[in-house]
Amino acid sequence: FLTNSITRMQKRDGGTKNGIGVFLRELKERCFAPHDAFTVGEVFEVDREQLEEFIGEDGYFSTMFAFDPIQSYKKGTCQCEFDRNMNPDEWKRDVFVNQKLLGDIAFEANIIENHDMARGATIYIPDEDYGFASISALAGLQVLQRGMPFLYQGQEIGMTNCHRNDISEYDDISTKDQYQVAIDAGCTKEEALACCYENSRDNALSLIHI
């Protein structure tokens, strides 16, 4: 299963190769800079000391996606351990920490959801509170942050996760893997399927549904 492969990779080299900056610097100088290109990096867990290497006036990229503030609902190593909804206090805390961390170095690309995540409307808003007012409030919280808001397709109309009746209806291999992990951990098929509904990246890849 994919989880075991990732674990082996992390044990081998931490999941990230050292010295990537040499390649990224050359990429910027030879490909981006000659065209004065605006670039967005998909970068995780960059600490304060590394920020100026990655973004800003002399960074590898113009900006990067703000992943840190949207990770707090992910608990444990299995999706069945994740929180059902994003805790608003934790999200507020992480947004403030991230904004202060950036300081005057640069701005980030603020996101609520992307192609690898469940729908933001489902993560951030309890089912009983879903509606025009709550979706509008969520949008306001995103666009009023310092930075550049990035909207993923379907987010502009408040799309939610998509229910599926069986694991065979999912295409994403990591979802199938997590389903089996949940089953092996003692979850029923219904509970494992509920985890898939709440967290599968297939939610972001589905067509508009009613």
Where is each model-derived feature located?
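Active-site and adjacent substrate-binding regions of carbohydrate-active enzymes
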Residues: 1-208
